[in-house]
Every structure is written in C-alpha cells, then in structure tokens.
C-alpha cells in the first residue's frame, strides 16, 4: 500500500435509540435526510471535498442498509485500488472477533487497517452529524500547533452545554480540561466528535486503554482525559458553521425544516461544497393540475396532486388529490391517500396512508410509553406501515414499522398513544 499522510475512520455503528422507530431497523447514520441524502453522506462528502481519499467506515448496529448505501464508494469517487472506502465490521474477525465495546475499542480493533497505510495523522469522525467542514484546514491548524490531538469544537447555547463534552481552553485554544456533560459548565465549547491525532501517539493510548479492564473504551470518557492528564499537546479547533446532532426526533425534524427556511441556515446548493450520494433512478417530479407546492423540498419521482407546504418529500412520494401535507417529512415511496391531512409528522419509507386520514391533530401530550422520545408534538410512522382509511391520529403518536391496517385497534388513535406491531395500543 502507498503511504498516506492522513486517513479517516468514520464511526457509523451507533443505533441512535433516541430516534425511536426511525432506527428500529437501520443504524442512525443510514437515516434519510434532506429529501435526498443519508446522514453519513455529509461526513463522507466532507472527506472527498477535503482531499481525504482513504476512509474506513466502522459499522456495527443493523449495518445492511448502510453497507448497501456505501457500496464501493463510487458516488464519493472512492472506488479506488489504493485507498478508497472500506467497510470495517466487527463480525468479520473470525472466531476471535467481538463486538466493539466503545468508540476507542472500535478503532483499536482496526489498528491493522490503519497501519497498512502508515499515516502520520488519523481523523476520527462521527457518521451521525449534519455539517459541512473542510478537514484540511483543521489539519493545518493541528500541524501549526505541533499538536498530539486536535478536537473540533463549536459554541453551543449555555443552557444546552451540560448535554455535551465540554472543552475548557486557554485563549490560544490549547485545552487544559475536558468535562463530559458537566452539570455546571465553565465553557460552552462543545466537542463535535471530530478528532485529529498523530497516529503513533493515538496507537499507544489505544493499546494501553485496551489493557484497562475498568475502561469504557471511549474517546470522550477515557482516551482524551488520559492524554490531558499526561500533558499531551491538545488543541481545540473552533468551527463556526452549521452543525447539528440530529439524534432526537425534534432535532431531526428541526434540521430538515432548516433546509426550507426563507434563508436556509444550512445551504445544500453550494456548488463549491457538494454533498454526494447515490442517485435514485427516477424521473423528474411531477405536480399535477390539482397539485400545489410551497416552500418545500420535493425530490425525484414524486407525484403531487394535493397540497404540500413547508415539508420535505423524498423520492417517489405520491400525494393524492385533496391531500394536504404541512410541516412534515415524508420518506421515499410513501403514498398519501385522497383527502388526507398530515400535520407535523415524520412518515417513514414505503408507508401507505389511506383516504380521509387526519394525522397530527389534537392535544400536545407527551407519549405515554416513551415520553422522553416523543414529546415535541411530532407523530412518527415507521417504515412500511399501513394506516387505514378514515383514521384520526393525534400528536406524539408512534406507529411501529410494518403495521397493517388490520392491526390498528381502532380508527381513533388519541395523542400520546403508541400503535405496536401485533395490534396493541398503549
């Protein structure tokens, strides 16, 4: 193998359990976003646009959809003999293999992959954030400061700082303290989960961490604190662009809505920084004589005979005559029946919603079964569910994937209820 100055390791094994039914059958990085993409496309495209041509994608939870999406890396120009994209799954490691025990352990298990390229630097990325970033500028900053590790940070609202790993720094950006989700933060500089390490330094710490049976084998909890404690040169690289952890239903919905605001906070139309993804083989979208679309993203293959307002539609969505979709996300190949009204909902892939359905109505009461997941007024329908004609569905309702019309307990699903596979409602 030819030596590489820098390679990327993209951590894409997370379940994303806070996304509820959206990640019941796929990993969080494979979740659809923005009418066209999957979340992982942003980190992969950042690599391409930053001239990083060697990427190892570390998968674990429900990897099939992700593996199929990435393939040999052609959409990102990573179908290469030397370098390119490689899927690194723990279950490929014969009888001695084991599941990744943490983010640091995931990298430790793939030391041999990194060593093949003898890089001077390794950039560790998370596959479940939405942002556009030039990693080569971060690498320049790392070199200028003779750093052992550089951590990309972003200012978050003070009231949210306790949800993140927080970096406390000197004025010049050198890190003197790291606090994981502090109750009383001293800074609002949050880690973005983007790290550049000198590879030989990181490898030493990964090997030592693996030998510590009490370690959680996590970058934030173990590797970074250990390096700081031992006086390694660690620097914070401040990022000023758009960055979102779309790890909750509300954050995911809000980030999609950001794309269709009057002046989009996150611009996907920048020709200088393209986001690449496999393109569906579908015709252009069609708006019929009874159709209307306002302030929405409508992808290829959609057929619109109803009204779509302030919404994001993925490829192949069919909106029947008289139907109305407002403030909603409708994923690929779903069908919305005649005279159906959809308000502030997330509809999964290949869902069939019947005629005369009203969804997202009533009181905004947190979901009874999972109030910590469904509490922002958004109703979520899992993939390939079938919603029967005439159904009235409230807010913060969750409908399991693959539910059939016959499994609905009634045609009136009140706010805060859950319709579970098997016909139960809670």
UniProtKB/Swiss-Prot annotation:
InterPro entries: ADP-Glc_PPase, ADP_Glu_pyroP_CS, GlgC_bac, GlmU/GlgC-like_hexapep, NTP_transferase_dom, Nucleotide-diphossugar_trans, Trimer_LpxA-like_sf. Keywords: ATP-binding, Carbohydrate metabolism, Glycogen biosynthesis, Glycogen metabolism, Nucleotide-binding, Nucleotidyltransferase, Transferase. Alpha-D-glucose 1-phosphate binds at residues 100, 165, 180-181, 191. It comes from the Bacteria. Pfam families: Hexapep_GlmU (PF24894), NTP_transferase (PF00483). GO terms for biological process: glycogen biosynthetic process. Homotetramer. Belongs to the bacterial/plant glucose-1-phosphate adenylyltransferase family. This is Glucose-1-phosphate adenylyltransferase. The gene is glgC.
């Amino acid at each position: 193998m030819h030596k590489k100055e820098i390679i990327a390791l993209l951590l894409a094994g997370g379940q994303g359990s806070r996304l509820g039914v959206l990640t019941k059958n796929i990993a969080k990085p494979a979740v659809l976003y923005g009418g066209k993409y999957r979340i992982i496309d942003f980190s992969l495209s950042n690599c391409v646009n930053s001239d990083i041509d060697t990427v190892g994608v570390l998968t674990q939870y429900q990897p099939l959809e992700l593996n199929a999406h990435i393939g040999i890396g052609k959409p990102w120009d990573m179908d290469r003999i030397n370098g390119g994209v490689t899927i690194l799954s723990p279950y490929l490691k014969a009888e001695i293999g084991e599941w990744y025990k943490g983010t640091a352990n995931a990298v430790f298990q793939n030391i041999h992959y990194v060593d093949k390229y003898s890089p001077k630097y390794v950039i560790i990325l998370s596959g479940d954030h939405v942002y556009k970033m030039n990693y080569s500028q971060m690498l320049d900053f790392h070199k200028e400061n003779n750093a052992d590790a550089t951590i990309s940070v972003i200012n978050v609202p003070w009231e949210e700082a306790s949800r993140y790993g927080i970096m406390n720094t000197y004025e010049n950006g050198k890190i003197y303290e790291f606090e994981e989700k502090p109750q009383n933060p001293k800074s609002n500089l949050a880690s973005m989960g983007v790290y550049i390490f000198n590879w030989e330094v990181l490898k030493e710490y990964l090997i030592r961490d693996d030998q510590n049976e009490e370690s959680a084998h996590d970058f934030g909890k173990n590797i970074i604190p250990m390096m700081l404690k031992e006086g390694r040169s660690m620097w914070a690289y401040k990022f000023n662009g758009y960055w979102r952890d779309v790890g909750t239903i509300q954050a995911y919905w809000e980030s999609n809505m950001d794309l269709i605001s009057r002046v989009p906070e996150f611009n996907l139309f920048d020709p200088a920084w393209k986001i690449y993804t496999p393109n569906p083989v579908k015709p252009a979208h069609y708006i019929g004589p009874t159709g209307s679309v306002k302030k929405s993203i409508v992808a290829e293959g959609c057929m619109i005979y109803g009204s779509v307002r302030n919404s994001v539609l993925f490829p192949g969505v069919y909106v029947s005559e008289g139907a109305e979709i407002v403030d909603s996300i409708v994923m690929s190949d779903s069908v919305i029946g005649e005279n159906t009204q959809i308000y502030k909902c997330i509809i999964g892939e290949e869902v069939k919603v019947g005629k005369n359905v009203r969804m997202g109505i009533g009181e905004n009461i947190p979901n009874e079964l999972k109030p910590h997941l469904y509490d922002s007024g958004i109703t979520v329908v899992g993939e390939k569910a079938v919603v029967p004609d005439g159904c009235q569905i409230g807010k913060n309702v969750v409908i399991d994937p693959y539910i059939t019309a016959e499994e609905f307990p009634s045609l009136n699903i009140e706010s805060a209820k859950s319709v579970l596979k098997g016909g139960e409602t809670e």
